[in-house]
Amino acid sequence: MRISYKALGANGRLGNQLFQIAGTLGRAQRAGDINNAVFPNWAYQPYFNVPNHYFVAANEITATIDGGYAYMQDLREFSSCTEVIQEFFQPTEFAITEARSLHRHFNQHAHTTAVHVRRGDYLGIPATFTVCPIHYFTQAMNEMRAKFPETHFLVLSDDSEWCIENFAQFTDVTVVTSPINATPVQSVMADFNLMRSCDAFIISNSTYSWWAAYSSQSTDVICPSRWLNGLASTQIPIETLLPNHWQRRSIDPIGPMRTPQLLVSEGDDGFIITDTRSRKIHNLNASASLLFELCTGSNTTDDINEIMNMVFPDDSWASGLQELLSLGLVQPAL
């Protein structure tokens, strides 16, 4: 019986879809014949070297063992056929030609490090996903500079404005913006193949950059030490998701304060914070939001004092910190 994944293209974006293909191929291999895998026709077929015989019209996929809506984000799913996966997931000549026509950044530097910053939808679902903080990227970039002094960083993101604001001051960094006059599929693949062409990687907790790094076969990959939050982290264990040779780095805050079980979103005037323990909602004004972000993010105590004393020369911000503490919105780091 054939092994299928009928939901391909309808359950997550490109990174998730690559895991679904790899996992299904792995299951078919374990069942006796990798060629028994079958998928519905796929928007990204022209960009990868997966043989066309694996794809058929959706209504032709019948009497199969189907993967349902499993994400299959587990190296063990395709450990029996990793060489085949690497071969199938290499870019076609068409993919490379199109990417080069949309991005001018190929082969402009002797050594390049791809930096992928995933923000976008993650900002709205903090219970499941942590947005990698700025210090994760800056510290990882410094590691790469020490190892590869000539490297040039290509930063790709779904939030290029944030990246320009935080990285544009560095002369060895280029923030890559999405190509104009490209379809969504063309844009996704141009960015993916530009990333994949790099020599080293600093990835977010994103399957998109995971596959760019993995399929490049680079030995120089820095990745977050934590991928998901809460219950989701037990469903996709980090130990079976990340290759052993990738260098894991913390994405935990380095500020002097920690947050308890809070959900944080952005309102018109400041942060809206929901305490999941009491379900109480706190609306912070702009100055309280600034202090909350500084104390729980990528800033040392000295950084916080310097910034807040510039904003509030009369030292009045200290009472604001006490208010955050009394409300239980922050607590001292241990």
Model-derived regions, located:
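N-terminal pre-catalytic "stem/leader" segment of glycosyltransferase-like enzymes
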Residues: M1-F39
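Short hydrophobic beta-strand segments
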Residues: M1-G9, I34-A37, A110-D121, L154-V155, ...
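Secretory-pathway luminal glycosyltransferase catalytic domains
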Residues: S4, P40-F148
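Donor-binding and catalytic core of enzymes assembling or modifying cell-surface/extracellular glycoconjugates
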Residues: A10, L14, F148-T240
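Short amphipathic alpha-helical segment that frequently serves as the phosphate-/nucleotide-binding helix
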Residues: Q17-A22, I134, T138, A288
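Leloir-type glycosyltransferase catalytic cores
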Residues: P91-T97, L231-G255
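Long, low-complexity, charged/polar intrinsically disordered regions in eukaryotic proteins
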Residues: S250-R279
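Long, charge-rich, low-complexity alpha-helical segments
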Residues: R277-L334
